[in-house]
Amino acid sequence: CCRLACGLGCHPCC
């Protein structure tokens, strides 16, 4: 995923 809440970048965190 690509979300600001997950940090600056795209990774499977959502």
UniProtKB/Swiss-Prot annotation:
One of its GO terms (cellular component) is extracellular region. It comes from the Eukaryota. The modification 4-hydroxyproline is found at residue 12. Its main location: secreted. One of its GO terms (molecular function) is toxin activity. Disulfide bonds join 1-14, 2-10, 6-13. Keywords: Amidation, Disulfide bond, Hydroxylation, Secreted, Toxin. It is found in: Secreted. Expressed by the venom duct. The modification Cysteine amide is found at residue 14. Belongs to the conotoxin M superfamily. The cysteine framework is III (CC-C-C-CC). This is Conotoxin Ar1446.
